């Protein structure tokens, strides 16, 4: 049957074969499409039936064996899946899905050490995008059993291979803060920026690392580069405002926070931060205005009402403070 036949025709042919009425022939590609169709509609039993039949007709098809193993894992038949993957590896040890699925099976069987050893060995066999995919997989394994330093190491390796990898850049920012490896992150991102000066995420991560070391002036400079490259980078404005507040640069912080409101969905914490800045520069009316905006978004937070009352007290308007708290 031609590979470009409509999926409905393929399904009819498959059903005839299952019923023992068909004398036709389904190609390897047709079985792949049928399995994918049943998998997409969450009909795992039919997908497995198609996989079993496909493997029976094409016992040397690595692709069909891998699909069968994937379905076995979905059905929590992990040991059977490992046996099928062993057969697939004999046919094509360069299929990255074999290693990813075997890792999933090992983790499900609580065999983390085997999963790590498998991936570490496989990483040396692949290059390019496939090596990066395996490093992400290894990072996830380390995350599962809380080897957090090793997650940072995996992400750093990915960025050594692909300095513009957005997923790695996003993730390493979090893990830098979590592991406290700010100095290492600074060296890494300075190197990336040297080669790719318009990488806004690298500038952001550099700024965040400086911020982690309380080097707020350097942090602000790096955030300003990030927003010069990407003027809609709301998290850069948000973090830069925090650094400015720590340096008591409240008017500049207000400008950054107002930009956050323009770019992102309003949050009570942002309104509270603006209110705090106005309170620090003794513009109590504006402070109250933003604290009230925060309270509209989060009416159950009693601390916001105390902040409003506090501004009245600082103006010696005690009656209004009491009246506000009473309401």
Residue locations for each model-derived region?
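Start-of-helix register in tetratricopeptide repeats
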Residues: 29, 63, 97, 131-133, ...
